[in-house]
């Protein structure tokens, strides 16, 4: 039975920083890969490298979980997978509703990685009447007119918005009114929500802009390196000043 509406992970009450919470999925992904290879233990250095963080930060993060590892042995992989999964609330079923079944919404509905991480796509919702009843990833799309009932019937507390930006706030308001308390927003707009509702924004264009910044910086470094390796330019004779100042008396043809 879905319990997503009532359960809350203990991260806030235990005072785990948000930055640490944001890194826990990175550790879990690396640990899951180790578990699938039947690796029993892992050192903080090895796990930090796999997760893309430094080992001191990893050890500090794990101290919030009460996990310090064993000197000379490292961390028990299976126990850490369980511990982090429990902390993130992934040891239970989280029914999710996706609103906006265009290309992105349909792609998310077809993504097979949700179920293995504790998330079940319970409902697909769209404003287009022509979409109603259309199966996507084996789930029939339902109309937004029935949103309140859909959320209630499926015990949904997590909503995913993949609508055009102009419709996102209205959809957000309706989800919140129906009882949704966590929203993943893919629409390129900022949502306003009441206290107690968590929103995570995914903006692919921003991520691309950040990559463009790094590409530009790397290109600048390469250009500077080429300039440093180039032979010095020979000095050219000073131009003869004309009667009107710095311009030569006779301009080149």
Swiss-Prot record:
Residues 217-253 are annotated as: Disordered. Belongs to the transcriptional regulatory Rex family. Gene3D superfamilies: NAD(P)-binding Rossmann-like Domain, Winged helix-like DNA-binding domain superfamily/Winged helix DNA-binding domain. NAD(+) binds at residues 100-105. The keyword Coiled coil does not apply. Residues 26-65 bind DNA. It holds the Pfam family CoA_binding. GO terms for biological process: negative regulation of DNA-templated transcription; response to redox state. Homodimer. It comes from Streptomyces griseus subsp. griseus (strain JCM 4626 / CBS 651.72 / NBRC 13350 / KCC S-0626 / ISP 5235). This is Redox-sensing transcriptional repressor Rex. One of its GO terms (cellular component) is cytoplasm. It is found in: Cytoplasm. The keyword Transcription regulation applies. Keywords: Cytoplasm, DNA-binding, NAD, Repressor, Transcription, Transcription regulation. GO terms for molecular function: DNA binding; DNA-binding transcription factor activity. InterPro entries: CoA-bd (IPR003781), NAD(P)-bd_dom_sf (IPR036291), Rex_DNA-bd_C_dom (IPR009718), Tscrpt_rep_Rex (IPR022876), WH-like_DNA-bd_sf (IPR036388), WH_DNA-bd_sf (IPR036390). It comes from the Bacteria.
């Amino acid at each position: 039975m879905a319990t997503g509406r009532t359960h809350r992970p203990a991260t806030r009450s235990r005072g785990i920083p948000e930055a640490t919470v944001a890194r826990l999925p990175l550790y879990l992904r690396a640990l899951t890969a180790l578990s699938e290879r039947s690796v029993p233990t892992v050192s903080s250095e090895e796990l930090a490298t796999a997760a893309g963080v430094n080992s001191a930060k990893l050890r500090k993060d794990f101290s919030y979980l009460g996990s310090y590892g064993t000197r000379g042995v490292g961390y028990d992989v299976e126990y850490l997978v369980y511990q982090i999964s429990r902390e993130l609330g992934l040891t239970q079923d989280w029914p999710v509703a996706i609103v906006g079944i265009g290309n992105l919404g349909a792609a998310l509905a077809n993504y097979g990685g949700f179920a293995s991480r504790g998330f079940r796509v319970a409902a697909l919702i769209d404003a287009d009447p022509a979409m109603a009843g259309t199966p996507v990833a084996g789930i029939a799309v339902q109309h937004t007119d029935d949103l309140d009932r859909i959320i209630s019937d499926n015990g949904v507390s997590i909503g995913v918005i993949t609508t055009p930006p102009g419709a996102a706030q209205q959809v957000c308001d309706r989800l919140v009114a129906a009882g949704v308390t966590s929203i993943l927003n893919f629409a390129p707009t900022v949502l306003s929500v009441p206290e107690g509702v968590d929103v995570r924004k995914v903006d692919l264009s921003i991520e691309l802009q950040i990559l463009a910044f790094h590409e530009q910086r790397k290109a600048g470094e390469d250009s500077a390196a080429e300039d440093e390796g180039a032979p010095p330019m020979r000095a050219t004779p000073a131009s003869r000043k004309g009667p009107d100042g710095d311009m030569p008396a006779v301009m080149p043809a």
